[in-house]
Amino acid sequence: MKKIGVFGGTFDPIHIGHIYIAYEAYKILELDEVIFMPAGNPPHKKWKDITDEIIRYEMVKKAIEPYSFFSINNYEIEKKGLSFTYETLRYLHESFKEVELYFITGADCLVNLNSWKNINEIFKFSNLVVFNRPGFDKNDLLKRKEEFDREYCTNIVYLDLLNIEISSTLIRERVRESLEVKFFLPPGVVDIIDKYNLYRRE
């Protein structure tokens, strides 16, 4: 059975940390493919503060160009209304049929997992893969993982990855302050930021 990773996010902008996480998940879990799923109208974030979805899609598409095992899906962008994870996973499950899905997300999401809508469907349609993030204690995360495993009769995969302390927020702030960002971004993404004059002071 084909194994497909699903890596969702706002990607505003996508950076080398995202690429590293997706690659490590691909390698460690022996996935056949990782699908990047840029968020359309994410329920957990303020819509007015997010770059236009078409531009974010363009940045992700450019960033993953060199990798044959990465792809991009526009389901959440094309979908009208709020985008919830369980709906995305259900759509992919129904679209691909005979596949095993691995939903890749950060430690912050594990901490707040009980607030997610229809969490049982997330476990029904996918294997949850959680990677560590700066500021989160590994032992606390593993304890939380065990609690969710028992509560939902599942087996969350924990990836203990190298902490790359780069965030989209940091990059946006550096652009606003006219500081260099090209070393934090995949090739071509800086050009798109310049093309649309993103993140700069108005």
UniProtKB/Swiss-Prot annotation:
Top EC group: transferase
Keywords recorded for this protein, A-Z: ATP-binding, NAD, Nucleotide-binding, Nucleotidyltransferase, Pyridine nucleotide biosynthesis, Transferase
Catalytic activities: nicotinate beta-D-ribonucleotide + ATP + H(+) = deamido-NAD(+) + diphosphate
Sample GO molecular function, one term: nicotinate-nucleotide adenylyltransferase activity
GO biological-process terms attached to the record: NAD biosynthetic process
E.C. number: 2.7.7.18
InterPro entries per UniProt: Cyt_trans-like, NadD/NMNAT, Rossmann-like_a/b/a_fold
Pfam family, one: CTP_transf_like
Gene3D superfamilies: HUPs
Pathway listed: Cofactor biosynthesis; NAD(+) biosynthesis; deamido-NAD(+) from nicotinate D-ribonucleotide: step 1/1
Family: Belongs to the NadD family.
Alphabetized PANTHER family for the sequence: NICOTINATE-NUCLEOTIDE ADENYLYLTRANSFERASE-RELATED, PHOSPHOPANTETHEINE ADENYLYLTRANSFERASE
Biological role: Catalyzes the reversible adenylation of nicotinate mononucleotide (NaMN) to nicotinic acid adenine dinucleotide (NaAD).
Cited NCBIfam families: cyt_tran_rel, nicotinate (nicotinamide) nucleotide adenylyltransferase, PRK00071.1-3
Protein name: Probable nicotinate-nucleotide adenylyltransferase
Species this chain originates from: Clostridium perfringens (strain 13 / Type A)
